[in-house]
Amino acid sequence: MNIFADFDARIKKTLQDIDLKPKDGGELDLSRIGVEPPRDASHGDIATNAAMVLSKAVGQNPRELAARIAEALKADEDVESVDVAGPGFINLRLKASYWQRELLVMLNEGTDFGRSRLGAGKKVNVEYVSANPTGPMHVGHCRGAVVGDVLANLLKFAGYDVVKEYYINDAGAQIDVLARSVMLRYREALGESIGEIPAGLYPGDYLVRVGQELAGEFGTKLLEMPEAEALAIVKDRTIDAMMAMIRADLDALNVHHDVFYSERKLHVDHARAIRNAINDLTLKGHVYKGKLPPPKGQLPGDWEDCEQTLFRSTEVGDDIDRPLMKSDGSFTYFAGDVAYFKDKYDRGFNEMIYVLGADHGGYVKRLEAVARAVSDGKAKLTVLLCQLVKLFRNGEPARMSKRAGEFITLRDVVDEVGRDPVRFMMLYRKNDAPLDFDFAKVTEQSKDNPVFYVQYASARCHSVFRQAADQLGLVDLDRVAMGSHFEKLTDESEIALVRKLAEYPRLIESAAIHQEPHRLAFYLYDLASSFHSQWNRGTENPDLRFIKVNDPDLSLARLGLVQVVSDVLTSGLTIIGADAPTEMR
């Protein structure tokens, strides 16, 4: 249960009970009331701004109104004390019995604790990675892959119906270049000396194997075909090979998509999907024939000094109108974006999330304009931009072997440090902030390595369970037994740990609403820190040890607390796509 939602309802009920009315009549607007943890934990457990946001409407001084509300809240049987602070904040401190009762709820819910129905009935498409199928994934793709995957997992946990999607850019000019590059490797595999790879083609050694496979399958037959026919075959085989490589790279990172959508699908049957999308926009009055003035700076590839078919995107929030069809009748890449969004909308998605690299910042307004025009404002589109990742080794820029050409691959990074450190650390900054990834730091066993610190907390929880088996003979811990004596958890440090656990449902919902999966990584680190601190207190003070052989009921209660910590760590790490280890290896 979200305790902050619980007390939001209680506070609003209290406002009704004291018959609070606006001075001008009508109903009070309670939508701006906030209920959250105080910024300073010493001030209490729950804080609300109710008096400050309502004072003007009711015509009363904020502190006086706060005192009136506070007095009424003291009647709540779960409230220990109520204080008014600053200009009119109301801080509530809750009784230990409340936290003991909430801990039992958490224990009974297990790893489902924190699961929400926030997104019930909402269908969301999260598109991420969508790397061009021209080679292995490089480290620049890594952050977007993790952010998109974890965001999708988070939204699912918050009750949304989520589809993870990868858009295969397999219809552009770069694919023609790729096919010609592989054709060269095919000739090489047949024994021809090809010399230096010509400028403009892909030089990567990863294409050698594709050429060899073509030579094994076709022999010299491709050389005997008309070039266009041979290149079409090479293109299909190469896209399949590149996507197999990309899927393997993603699998190594524990990233899995539900849908792989081919751009070529938009171009079948004389690009019927694109034509239909443009026709729909035309019927809505969003398309016209015109000539765009030359933009400042470097000219984009779709600008022409002649009449084109244009999208009236400035009427729906964009900076400039966008070309859909060139003067020669060919479609722009942007026209495909329109058709692809329409395809998503026609599949019933209420919301589309695009996770893109920071170099795609110029796409944001045009995509938002497409969403407004295609859906008549009914669908929500969000673009998350991921800033660059800089690689370091002991504080110095990383120097790594580049086995795939001119870049460090995603697989290089995962193979060296492991999947879990990569996933966790890619979340340890907000996606729109640059991120430094230090190979030494993410493998050291210290508090300064967040993923180690969190996973070590999980392992420590299980070590407590093993101690219970050794010292108390409790091999199979029973949740009913563990939850039957929570009234014995009275130490302030234990209650503080319960408070931290109780924040989890609110954290899940806020991270989902704001689409900020990094919040989960931060929370797990804080929870791990709280648990490690409690462990250390037991080391310093025998009375606070989790296992008290001479007090089995207290031991069971503390084991229940440890079980909930383990459940929340497991839940959060699962959403992140990392393991919750039972022991460190």
Curated annotation (Swiss-Prot):
SUPFAM superfamilies: Anticodon-binding domain of a subclass of class I aminoacyl-tRNA synthetases, Arginyl-tRNA synthetase (ArgRS), N-terminal 'additional' domain, Nucleotidylyl transferase
Catalysis performed (reactions): tRNA(Arg) + L-arginine + ATP = L-arginyl-tRNA(Arg) + AMP + diphosphate
Top class in the EC scheme: ligase
Subcellular location: Cytoplasm
Family the entry assigns: Belongs to the class-I aminoacyl-tRNA synthetase family.
PANTHER family reported for this sequence: ARGININE--TRNA LIGASE, CYTOPLASMIC (PTHR11956:SF5), ARGINYL-TRNA SYNTHETASE (PTHR11956)
Motif 'HIGH' region, chain ranges: 131-141
Gene Ontology cellular component terms for the protein in this record: cytoplasm
Binding partners and assembly: Monomer.
Gene Ontology molecular function terms on file: arginine-tRNA ligase activity; ATP binding
Annotated keywords: Aminoacyl-tRNA synthetase, ATP-binding, Cytoplasm, Ligase, Nucleotide-binding, Protein biosynthesis
Alphabetical list of Gene3D superfamilies matching this protein: Arginyl tRNA synthetase N-terminal domain, HUPs, Isoleucyl-tRNA Synthetase, Domain 1
Gene that produces this protein: argS
PROSITE patterns assigned to the protein according to its UniProt record, in alphabetical order: AA_TRNA_LIGASE_I
Record-linked NCBIfam families: argS
Tagged with keyword Cell membrane: no
Record's protein name: Arginine--tRNA ligase
EC code(s) of this entry: 6.1.1.19
Keyword Nucleotide-binding: yes
GO biological-process terms attached to the record: arginyl-tRNA aminoacylation
